[in-house]
């Protein structure tokens, strides 16, 4: 608090579903504290943070920090609603003066009061009527209950009055590192970054793997995929966000020898799954949506999944339309990067007539024709793990 009771701008972030965790709530809040501390360190933010039962409060916010803090807390899993507020002690004269500054440029106003301190002398209804009456008598400002030009929200805590200046939604979910580890198959397209982000929001620490081939990929393509990983992880602020780049060139040449060209994409994606599973994450994430492309029919997905029977694969987009996925990609901020032109491995490798009803017996027979797939997979994974 500054001299002369100057208002202190704070940021209130409510926990959302963390409050419902019962005996485990403290574990989730403890991890949220670690995540906020890590993010603040990366972003060189030194503001004090007070952790309360159902929310955290960032103090001493200056105007130049608002955009940075909003960008962080909009994306930080575990938080629901966030509020910037002016904080003053229980001084009604100062509260009225600040309210007058907020509403004076508007033709009408409405006051809403939330009394978090139930021992405060007035109840919420009586206090908002009192404030509105005082604004009319002192400043001739017109209150209006229906369709006002501005609605001002005031909260009453044990020691302070709060005037809410801005509110925005967090993404909810659970703090990262509370659910385990996940490896996202990142193609560079629209879908996979959205899928990774949705799983990250459920408390997973997400890393990424992408598959490149020569000569279809170059430094620009890899740079694009790295930017997508950075966008999902908020430049490693939300999770570790490591990107594994697997050179698929030799495996692609090996797969080109199969006798049934239409099965090429199915075999390739089985290789992707197998490679990703060898990194021993708790689960894999893919951007597959049912029926969106030939490899994503239910028959093909079952055959692809069969190569990793002991690996849990999360497909958060499985029932979504492309329009909805694009909407989420735009909200996430990955859409413009995703639509930059590049050649992904699936596109380079696509047959003219891909099968949509793959049979496991046929796939296993085709794989038996390939002599070096296992060796190439193990060598490629070992190389990345040792880097």
From Swiss-Prot:
Molecular-function annotations in GO: ATP binding; CCA tRNA nucleotidyltransferase activity; tRNA binding; tRNA-uracil-4 sulfurtransferase activity
Q: Where does ATP bind?
A: 185-186, 210-211, 269, 287, 296
The pathway entry for this protein reads as: Cofactor biosynthesis; thiamine diphosphate biosynthesis
The enzyme's E.C. designation: 2.8.1.4
**What is the protein name given in its UniProt record?**
Probable tRNA sulfurtransferase
Please tell me which top-level EC class this enzyme sits in: transferase
Q: Where in the cell is it found?
A: Cytoplasm
Function of the protein: Catalyzes the ATP-dependent transfer of a sulfur to tRNA to produce 4-thiouridine in position 8 of tRNAs, which functions as a near-UV photosensor. Also catalyzes the transfer of sulfur to the sulfur carrier protein ThiS, forming ThiS-thiocarboxylate. This is a step in the synthesis of thiazole, in the thiamine biosynthesis pathway. The sulfur is donated as persulfide by IscS.
- GO biological process, alphabetically ordered: thiamine biosynthetic process; thiamine diphosphate biosynthetic process; thiazole biosynthetic process; tRNA 4-thiouridine biosynthesis
What reactions does this protein catalyze? [ThiI sulfur-carrier protein]-S-sulfanyl-L-cysteine + a uridine in tRNA + 2 reduced [2Fe-2S]-[ferredoxin] + ATP + H(+) = [ThiI sulfur-carrier protein]-L-cysteine + a 4-thiouridine in tRNA + 2 oxidized [2Fe-2S]-[ferredoxin] + AMP + diphosphate; [ThiS sulfur-carrier protein]-C-terminal Gly-Gly-AMP + S-sulfanyl-L-cysteinyl-[cysteine desulfurase] + AH2 = [ThiS sulfur-carrier protein]-C-terminal-Gly-aminoethanethioate + L-cysteinyl-[cysteine desulfurase] + A + AMP + 2 H(+)
Which HAMAP family does the entry link to?
A: ThiI
Keywords, in A-Z order: ATP-binding, Cytoplasm, Nucleotide-binding, RNA-binding, Thiamine biosynthesis, Transferase, tRNA-binding
Family, as annotated: Belongs to the ThiI family.
THUMP domain location is 67-167
Q: Membrane-spanning residues where?
A: none
Instruction: Spell out the SMART domains in the cross-references.
Output: THUMP
């Amino acid at each position: 608090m500054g001299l002369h009771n100057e208002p202190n701008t704070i940021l209130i972030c409510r926990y959302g579903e963390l409050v419902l965790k019962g005996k485990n709530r403290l574990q989730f809040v403890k991890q949220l504290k670690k995540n906020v501390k890590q993010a603040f360190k990366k972003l060189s933010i030194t503001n004090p943070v007070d952790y309360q039962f159902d929310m955290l409060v960032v103090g001493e916010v200056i105007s130049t920090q608002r955009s940075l803090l909003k960008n962080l807390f909009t994306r930080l899993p575990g938080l629901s609603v966030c509020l910037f507020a002016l904080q003053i002690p229980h001084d009604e004269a100062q509260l009225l003066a600040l309210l007058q500054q907020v509403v004076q440029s508007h033709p009408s106003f409405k006051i809403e009061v939330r009394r978090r301190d139930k021992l405060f002398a007035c109840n919420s209804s009586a206090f908002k009527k009192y404030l509105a009456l005082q604004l009319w008598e002192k400043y001739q400002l017109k209150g209006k209950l229906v369709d006002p030009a501005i609605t001002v929200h005031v909260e009453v805590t044990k020691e302070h009055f709060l005037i809410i200046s801005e509110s925005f939604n967090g993404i909810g979910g659970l703090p990262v590192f509370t659910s385990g580890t996940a490896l996202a198959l990142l193609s560079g397209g629209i879908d996979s970054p959205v899928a990774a982000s949705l799983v990250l929001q459920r408390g997973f620490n997400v890393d990424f793997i992408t598959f490149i081939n020569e000569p279809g990929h170059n430094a620009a393509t890899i740079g694009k995929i790295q930017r997508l990983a950075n966008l999902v992880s908020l430049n490693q602020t939300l999770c570790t966000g490591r990107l594994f780049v697997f050179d698929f060139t030799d495996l692609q040449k090996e797969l080109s020898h199969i006798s049934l060209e239409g099965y090429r994409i199915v075999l390739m994606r089985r290789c992707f799954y197998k490679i990703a599973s060898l990194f021993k994450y708790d689960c894999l994430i893919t951007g597959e949506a049912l029926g969106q492309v030939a490899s994503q029919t239910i028959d093909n997905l079952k055959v692809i999944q069969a190569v990793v029977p002991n690996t849990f694969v999360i497909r958060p987009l499985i029932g979504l339309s492309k329009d909805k996925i694009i909407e989420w990609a735009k909200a996430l901020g990955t859409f413009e990067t995703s639509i930059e032109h590049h050649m992904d491995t699936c596109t380079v490798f696509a047959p003219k007539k891909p099968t949509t009803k793959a049979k496991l017996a046929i796939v296993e027979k085709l794989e038996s024709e390939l002599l070096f797939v296992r060796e190439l997979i193990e060598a490629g994974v070992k190389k990345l793990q040792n880097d």
